[in-house]
Amino acid sequence: DPNGLSEVLNFCGQTLSGVRKLSGGTFLKMDDLPQHDKDMLVEERLASRELAESSYGRGVFVSADKSCAVMVNEEDHLRIQTFSKGLNLAAALRSANAIDDGFEKNAKYAFSPTFGYLTACPTNTGTGLRASVMMHLPALALSDLMDKVVRGLSQLGICVRGASGEGSDSFGSFF
């Protein structure tokens, strides 16, 4: 429903602009951007390719320092991404929580005591949280060991993805 997407987009943009962690940031509507700007957002990992290629009613709120981005109407209504250097997942989680808490002051999430947070994509239901790291592994990529490492990590419940996320190939030994 195009009107529903537009309403969600406008509400989220307005609500996110009041979140302290995003202060000074920019809300970008995909419909208003030229293709090269969309490509830059994807290259900087601030928006997914799916969001950039989608049409009406989608956008992204980017913090001033580009350490946080919130995609609106991508796979789910909101996708909060935070970035930190040096495998500092705790700092990234604190930033994501600050955005989430700020947004939740003015919005109500769909929540079930049985299933957790209800999302448009059923595989994201529950906490909706996924932690990811990007690593440069040139020695493993050049050796015959990378396939073994991927299989071993898979047995531990860890997914290895390409540089652009799910379903993408790695390039330059980035995983």
Which residues does each PLM region occupy?
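Long, Pro/Ser/Thr-rich low-complexity/intrinsically disordered regulatory tracts in eukaryotic proteins
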Residues: 1-114, 129, 141-143, 147-175
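Conserved phosphate/anionic-ligand binding catalytic regions in large, soluble enzymes, centered on
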Residues: 116-135
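Phosphate-binding loop of NTP-binding sites
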Residues: 138
